[in-house]
């Protein structure tokens, strides 16, 4: 069965069946175009970021009675609208190596068919990145080792230094990474 998880809970737990999905869309690069009188062609002004992306799942659920359907849909709404003011982890069975961070977006317009089938589209407003699950695992690196990013986009890893003694960063070294120093006495 195909499924998505949101905030640690699976759609399969509710018996939701995914009819269609839009999960592979790429985010829009945030740029604007500036026209200048007397000059052919617009200037491109980059905001140096990607906009959030919409991820949607169209789902349906069957139940034996209208009461069962109503109870289940109430539980689904409780699940999806828990903490709607923050991003939550989203995974699915279609793209199982990656996860996203998103929040429910818009309303749930639930259409009932034959009074026992509920159909609706769940839309999440997601950060523009997908995170490779194994890339979120902690990795130990020793002196002289290298870190390699296999993805096409740049990443900013969280680097934690542990050990004893003085920590010196060469004056010529520059970094855009978050470095947390944890040196024991």
Regions found by a protein language model. Give the residues of each.
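Intrinsically disordered, low-complexity segments enriched in serine, threonine, and glycine
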Residues: 132-185
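Short amphipathic alpha-helices in soluble, non-transmembrane regions
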Residues: 71-80
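Short helix C-cap/helix-to-loop transition motifs enriched in small/turn-promoting residues
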Residues: 79-87
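Oligomerization/assembly interface segments of phage tail-like spikes and tubes
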Residues: 42-67, 116-129
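Solvent-exposed edge beta-strands and adjacent loop segments
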Residues: 1-54, 97-109
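Beta-strand-rich interaction surfaces with strong enrichment in secreted/lumenal proteins
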Residues: 45-46, 111-112, 145-147
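Short beta-strand and beta-hairpin "edge-sheet" elements
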Residues: 86-130
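Short polybasic amphipathic segments
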Residues: 1-7, 88-90, 168-172
């Amino acid at each position: 069965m195909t499924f998505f998880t949101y905030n640690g809970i699976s759609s399969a737990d509710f018996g939701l069946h995914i009819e269609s999905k839009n999960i592979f869309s790429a985010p829009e690069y945030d740029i604007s175009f500036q026209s200048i009188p007397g000059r052919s062609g617009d200037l491109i002004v980059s905001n140096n970021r990607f906009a959030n992306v919409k991820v949607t799942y169209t789902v349906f659920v069957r139940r034996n009675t209208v009461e069962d359907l109503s109870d289940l849909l109430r539980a689904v709404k409780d699940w999806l609208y828990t903490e709607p003011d923050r991003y939550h982890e989203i995974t699915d069975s279609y793209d199982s190596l990656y996860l996203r961070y998103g929040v429910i977006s818009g309303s749930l317009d639930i259409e009932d068919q034959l009074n026992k089938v509920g159909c609706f589209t769940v839309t999440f407003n997601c950060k523009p990145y997908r995170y490779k699950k194994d890339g979120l695992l902690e990795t130990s690196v020793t002196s002289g080792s290298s870190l390699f990013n296999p993805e096409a986009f740049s990443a900013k890893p969280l680097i934690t230094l542990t050990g004893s003694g003085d920590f010196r960063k060469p004056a010529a070294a520059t970094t855009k990474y978050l470095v947390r120093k944890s040196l024991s006495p």
